[in-house]
């Protein structure tokens, strides 16, 4: 059974441990993410979810364990190597260039994906090939009509959409999304759910998220983390009715919703 699970996985995490002082942020975490669809990781604050994503992206090195992506260990690979291998990450806090336009941000992401250094002093906006590719990604997230706007002048939700477009510009096999709904309003959340549903039909997504409505709408598989450990992984329906999950995180009302 484990061999079949591993064979079907684009991402296979084995016994991942990371401690900060005496605190175990990830404690013997093992997880298999199947190719295609959306796998969400949920849990209370301090459960280790963001630390897990940081280890997967290469931002933080684990103390022990292994990470296999697309059949190869990436444990010793840096962030840039993992990105080139097909892992793209968005952050819990927006990480866009606020004084540049939406299109310029997307073009810089395309440029980075093509292996070129960011040409901050060059007239990037005059490169039509870059612009065309960038506009395709902006269209995917519904920002093509806002491409000329300065990022600081648009809503937080639109900045989150831009982050997704920039991640897509990396031509990833898998997206690592750290709370894509964080800080955005109800209407923008609905829009992001629509976007991620479309993206998830084409790409594998591993997503950390606190918005349970969004998680239940999007996820094909759910993993629940508590105190640095994965206590359950299953379908949404089975997670919602899991007594241990209800006791540790969701609360008894979720099974009745």
In which residue ranges do the predicted regions lie?
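Glycine-rich phosphate-binding loops of nucleotide-dependent enzymes
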Residues: 2-257
């Amino acid at each position: 059974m484990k061999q079949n699970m591993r064979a079907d996985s684009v991402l296979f995490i084995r016994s991942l441990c990371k401690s900060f002082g005496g605190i175990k942020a990830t404690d013997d975490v093992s997880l298999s993410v199947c190719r295609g669809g959306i796998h969400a990781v949920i849990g209370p604050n301090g459960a280790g979810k963001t630390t897990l994503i940081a280890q997967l992206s290469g931002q933080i090195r684990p103390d022990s364990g292994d990470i296999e992506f697309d059949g190869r260990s990436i444990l010793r690979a840096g962030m840039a190597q993992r990105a080139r291998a097909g892992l793209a990450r968005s952050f819990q806090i927006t990480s866009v260039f606020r004084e540049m336009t939406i299109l310029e941000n997307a073009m810089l992401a395309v440029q980075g994906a093509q292996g070129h250094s960011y040409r901050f002093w060059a007239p990037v906006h005059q490169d039509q090939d870059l612009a065309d590719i960038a506009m395709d990604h902006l269209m995917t997230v519904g920002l093509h009509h806002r491409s000329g706007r300065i990022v600081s002048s648009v809503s937080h939700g639109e900045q989150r959409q831009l982050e997704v477009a920039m991640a897509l510009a990396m031509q990833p096999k898998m997206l690592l999304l750290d709370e894509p709904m964080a800080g955005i309003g109800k209407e923008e959340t609905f829009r992001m759910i629509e976007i991620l549903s479309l993206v998830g039909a084409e790409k594998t997504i591993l997503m950390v998220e606190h918005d349970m409505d969004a998680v239940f709408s999007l996820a094909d598989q759910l993993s629940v983390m508590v105190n640095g450990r994965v206590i359950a992984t299953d379908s949404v329906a089975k997670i919602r009715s899991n007594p241990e999950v209800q006791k540790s995180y969701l609360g008894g009302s979720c099974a009745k919703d």
